[in-house]
Amino acid sequence: MYVLVCPGIHDPQATQDFLQGLQRVMDEAAFTWLIFPTDRYPAYSAIHISWFLCTQLRSVHLQDWLNQTVAIISFSAGVVGGIATAWSWRLMGGTIAALIAVDGWGVPLVGDFPVHRLSHDYFTHWSSALLGAGQDSFYAEPAVDHLSLWRSPETTQGWWFSPSSPSSPQLITAAEFIATLLSRYNARAVIEDES
């Protein structure tokens, strides 16, 4: 499964820190990672992100590039481009395993694919849910600043909320939450590929 990472408007080192934080809790080699270059294109530009995704997949899969399953992890302004790219990919006939929106406050998140929100504090968590709660979600407790959630997911503690058991949230790190979701959707993609 491909994982498209759509960073926000920040120093690219923060995205490298994010990926290193994920590496500490998951087998990164189980996925093919595509990091959208926000140093060359606007983080919020779905046109540029979609072009990047298509170009990357066509370079590897000449004939069946549209048959590749993609999960999208987006942060801040990248959530704007990420959700629009997910819809673009779906309209072209592609499969979106999930959209994981990290601190996409104020961005409506609705799709015919799983959507998950991570928030740096409780206020952002509940106020963002008004624009599409999605499925399982996470918020940092204690609260952290906006960029720290992206830069240090492995040390950001918080609560995992599941719609299937809303009365029993689980204490977890942001990195563990993301790793669990990616593992879940990767397993589904493998099963679908085999059938």
Where are these regions (language model features)?
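Gly/Ala-rich beta-loop-alpha elbow adjacent to hydrolase catalytic centers
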Residues: I72-G82
